From Swiss-Prot:
The active site is at H47. It catalyses: a (3R)-hydroxyacyl-[ACP] = a (2E)-enoyl-[ACP] + H2O. Belongs to the thioester dehydratase family. FabZ subfamily. This is 3-hydroxyacyl-[acyl-carrier-protein] dehydratase FabZ. CDD domains: FabZ. One of its GO terms (molecular function) is (3R)-hydroxyacyl-[acyl-carrier-protein] dehydratase activity. Coiled coil: none annotated. It is an enzyme of class 4 (lyase). HAMAP family: FabZ. Keywords: Cytoplasm, Lipid A biosynthesis, Lipid biosynthesis, Lipid metabolism, Lyase. Involved in unsaturated fatty acids biosynthesis. Catalyzes the dehydration of short chain beta-hydroxyacyl-ACPs and long chain saturated and unsaturated beta-hydroxyacyl-ACPs. Gene3D superfamilies: Hotdog Thioesterase. It comes from the Bacteria. It comes from Streptococcus pyogenes serotype M49 (strain NZ131).
Length: 140
């Protein structure tokens, strides 16, 4: 488990772009984290004022940050940066709205040098909200 201070020590992101609130579990190749979605998120001012929905690209960013925490929590990667390199097979299945708790999982499926590929899922109340295959590079 990791609290927000430990997450901030791993990731360079800060408000309003830090999209991981807590890590529930982490192993060598798998992580489970949460994002508590509130009406106070700045993106709800424009997406959409009368029908607030979390933008799908920000759900994918939250998943990428979750995978980033997994990669950057490894001793050999401390102090490095993770760069988003691609997304494939992305699907959005459920709207994410204020009051939802996004449960995010990422599992490494392939690694070659500094490039890693993860399967990522975001769920709300046990139902799939979004999923995809994310590629990223770990650099200096």
């Amino acid at each position: 488990m990791m609290d927000i201070r430990e997450i901030q020590a791993a990731l360079p992101h800060r408000y309003p772009m830090l999209l991981v609130d807590r890590v529930l579990e982490v192993s060598d190749d798998h992580i489970v984290a949460i994002k508590n979605v509130t009406i106070n998120e700045p993106f709800f001012n424009g997406h959409f004022p009368h029908y607030p929905v979390m933008p799908g690209v920000l759900i994918m960013e939250a998943l990428a940050q979750t995978a980033g925490v997994l990669e950057l929590s490894k001793e050999e990667n401390k102090g490095k940066l993770v760069f988003y390199a691609g997304m494939d097979k992305v699907k959005f299945k459920k709207q994410v709205v204020p009051g939802d708790q996004l449960v995010m999982t990422a599992t490494f499926i392939k690694r070659r040098g500094t490039i890693a590929v993860v399967e990522a899922r975001a769920e709300v109340d046990g139902k799939l909200a979004a999923s995809g295959t994310l590629t990223f590079a770990c650099g200096q």
